[in-house]
């Protein structure tokens, strides 16, 4: 590898991006994933929204997957999708296949005291109800990011994925 080669990133996902079709839209390829656990965080549902968030929690742990080999351009796509409500941070996860500790990027909810946070988010429940809409919406968001045509993201994409919780 030369210094001009693009840097590769690892991204820990724990919500809608666990769905292979959703990850494929963001990456424009099939994701290479490894199951992992993030200690020191808790995953919550968000009232009125169909996606979860994580915030720091001393006794918490979040199961998810590490997407490996993420390029700078793909990482930018994650940033676009996650928007301003999440902050990208570097954390350490434990791979479930070999117990190796790995540094990864993940997205933490900015408002750690958000009153909309509650309960446990359920991936299978989400998948049945929301997966197809997320694929369509994320595709529109990334198309808008490449060519906004003078429109705001909301104008181009429509209202983002409310759940009616």
From Swiss-Prot:
Triggers of expression: Expressed constitutively.
Family, as annotated: Belongs to the gamma-glutamylcyclotransferase family.
Record-listed substrate binding positions: 14-19
Alphabetical list of CDD domains matching this protein: GGCT_like
E.C. numbers: 2.3.2.-
Role description: Putative gamma-glutamylcyclotransferase.
InterPro entries to which the protein is assigned, alphabetical: AIG2-like (IPR045038), AIG2-like_dom (IPR009288), GGCT-like (IPR013024), GGCT-like_sf (IPR036568)
Keywords associated with the record: Acyltransferase, Transferase
Tissue specificity comment: Expressed in floral organs, leaves, stems and roots.
Active site: residue positions: 82
Protein name: Protein AIG2 C
Organism expressing this protein natively: Arabidopsis thaliana
SUPFAM superfamilies: Gamma-glutamyl cyclotransferase-like
